[in-house]
């Protein structure tokens, strides 16, 4: 009997809840092995597809899709509880309610996708076998387009929160080969199609599978095979010599990081790690990269002696240093003040005054700010006041900012969860209007200590891997508590430090040049394909069926 078959009233909600929980496990290795993530994701989502398509109405389909997604988000984002309760100081019931409220909101998007697909694709058991086979293919494509469209909408509404996009379960599957062409939303379309095609195999009133109903599943297999072939193609080419980098993971406990009494302890730890001599046979680093908010106070609140110490590290190592730091600046001629979450770069020749005023030549200001943590959405000041979050409102950086030019390579920085928003990384990789060439390496600095040693760390690494596949650019990640890593241009983790451990990661990173179709056009091709499928579905899906 299919998952939507007859049975006790509790049966189907229980199946959807279990499938949603299994779905949450598919977004990063541990506890599941990497090879199993894609199959688990497709099978779990197929349960939701089948249940929603066989719902008696679009409203019931919405409820079924929402229930599935509610369990998926609640478990997959459980680490939000850690940030709100353990480090934000929110009472346990309120922190749990916060996670559930966020999950309930996010689950509306999959729920609406299921409702739209059910409205466009009513059950068709009365159709002839050939028509049923054609309708199975059409239904799978329509359901996938609805799901992918709502995934995209989730990425843009209210600044967007596309964490747990289904594509991230497929960084080790053949579908990853499509990333350089269609990006995260195109992969979501293909993954959702595979799930709906599998659901189509269950859509038989007798419980038997008609061979003609396997048409959609066959197309899904062909798309996976094409993805594998595309994955063999090199979309970029090396430029210059490999860049030698030292990535620092300070592992400062989040509960201590912003404690004024422990400020000196954290600074000393990062100074010591940055000052370590290279191991025997290891070349000196061209740049030392430290995580987000290495300095947990604004740069002008520190005495000049702190900056003197950092300049001395750069002088002794004969290198440049990049670090995350909150900046307080007053632009020339401006009467106001700017507060930004930034990365600054400097070397032994950088004047201390530039460091204290935040006017270094190498600088990146975060542009996609975290709601409640880095800016306060209108009407939510009461919620922020309940949380013990330091620093507060920041100003946004420009959409395109200069890369850091180091030893013939050009590094484009992003901060925290900015690597979740692929289109926003692309301007830095493209040649500028002034002819300045695009970046050859991406670098993410973050502080995931807010979430403890949870799934968030491994999920974030998967996100970074997909960004490198989309752009055919390597990425390095320097984090406070993990996972500090180097990812090559094909999305493979070349080296990584264990989480919750202080250390340094010396890596040689080969810069790459050349634009993938996704790096050139962004989400436009995928959205065009999704839009065409939805237009076709709207034009055809509600036509009266011929008897």
Curated annotation (Swiss-Prot):
Species the sequence originates in: Bordetella pertussis (strain Tohama I / ATCC BAA-589 / NCTC 13251)
UniProt xrefs under HAMAP family: Lnt
Family: Belongs to the CN hydrolase family. Apolipoprotein N-acyltransferase subfamily.
Gene Ontology CC terms, in alphabetical order: plasma membrane
Keywords carried by this UniProt record: Acyltransferase, Cell inner membrane, Cell membrane, Membrane, Transferase, Transmembrane, Transmembrane helix
Superkingdom of the organism of origin: Bacteria
Record has Cell membrane as a keyword: yes
Function, in words: Catalyzes the phospholipid dependent N-acylation of the N-terminal cysteine of apolipoprotein, the last step in lipoprotein maturation.
Entry membrane topology: Multi-pass membrane protein
Signal peptide: none
Active site, renumbered: 292, 366, 416
Residue stretches making up the CN hydrolase domain: 248-511
Protein name: Putative apolipoprotein N-acyltransferase
EC number(s) on file: 2.3.1.269
Pathway: Protein modification; lipoprotein biosynthesis (N-acyl transfer)
GO terms under biological process: lipoprotein biosynthetic process
Main location: membrane
């Amino acid at each position: 009997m299919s998952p939507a078959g007859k049975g006790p009233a509790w049966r189907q909600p229980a199946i959807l809840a279990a499938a949603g929980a299994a779905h949450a496990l598919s977004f990063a290795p541990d506890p599941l092995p990497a090879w199993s993530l894609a199959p688990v994701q497709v099978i779990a989502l197929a349960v939701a597809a089948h249940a929603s398509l066989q719902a008696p109405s679009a409203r019931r389909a919405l409820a079924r899709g929402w229930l599935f997604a509610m369990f998926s988000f609640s478990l997959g984002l459980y680490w939000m509880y850690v940030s709100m309760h353990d480090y934000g100081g929110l009472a346990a019931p309120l922190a749990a309610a916060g996670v559930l409220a966020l999950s309930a909101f996010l689950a509306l998007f999959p729920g609406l996708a299921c409702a739209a697909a059910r409205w466009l694709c009513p059950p068709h058991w009365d159709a002839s076998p050939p028509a049923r086979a054609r309708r199975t293919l059409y239904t799978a494509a329509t359901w996938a387009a609805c799901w992918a469209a709502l995934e995209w909408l989730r990425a843009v509404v209210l600044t967007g929160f596309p964490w747990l996009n289904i594509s991230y379960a497929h960084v080790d599957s053949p579908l990853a080969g499509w990333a350089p062409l269609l990006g995260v939303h195109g992969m979501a379309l293909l993954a959702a199609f595979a799930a709906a095609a599998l659901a189509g195999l269950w859509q038989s009133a007798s419980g038997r599978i008609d061979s003609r109903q396997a048409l959609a599943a066959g197309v899904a297999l062909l798309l996976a095979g094409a993805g594998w072939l595309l994955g063999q193609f090199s979309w970029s080419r090396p430029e210059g010599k490999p860049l030698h980098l030292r990535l620092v993971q300070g592992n400062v406990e989040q509960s201590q990081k912003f404690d004024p009494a422990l400020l000196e302890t954290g600074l000393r730890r990062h100074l010591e790690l940055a000052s370590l001599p290279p191991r025997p046979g290891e070349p000196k680093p061209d740049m030392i990269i430290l995580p987000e908010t290495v300095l947990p106070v604004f740069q002008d609140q520190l005495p000049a002696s702190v900056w003197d110490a950092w300049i001395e590290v750069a002088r002794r190592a004969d290198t440049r240093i990049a670090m995350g730091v909150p900046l307080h600046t007053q632009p020339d001629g401006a009467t106001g003040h700017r507060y930004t979450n930034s990365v600054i770069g400097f070397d032994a020749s950088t004047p201390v005054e530039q460091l204290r005023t935040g006017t270094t030549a190498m600088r990146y200001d975060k542009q996609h700010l975290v709601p409640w943590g880095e800016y306060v959405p209108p009407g939510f000041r009461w919620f922020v006041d309940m949380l013990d979050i330091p620093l507060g409102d920041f100003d946004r950086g420009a959409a395109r900012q200069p890369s850091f030019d180091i030893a013939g390579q050009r590094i484009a920085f992003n901060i925290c969860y900015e690597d979740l928003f692929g289109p926003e990384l692309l301007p830095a990789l493209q040649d500028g209007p002034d002819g300045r060439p695009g970046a050859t390496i991406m670098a993410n600095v973050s502080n995931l200590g807010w979430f403890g040693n949870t799934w968030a760390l491994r999920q974030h690494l998967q996100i970074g891997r997909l960004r490198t596949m989309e752009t055919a650019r390597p990425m390095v990640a320097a984090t406070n508590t993990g996972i500090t890593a180097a990812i090559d241009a094909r999305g493979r983790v070349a080296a990584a430090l264990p989480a919750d451990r202080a250390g340094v990661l010396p890596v040689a990173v080969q810069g790459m040049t050349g634009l993938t179709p996704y790096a050139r056009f962004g989400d436009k091709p995928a959205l065009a394909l999704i839009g065409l499928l939805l237009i076709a579905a709207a034009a055809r899906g509600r036509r009266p069926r011929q008897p």
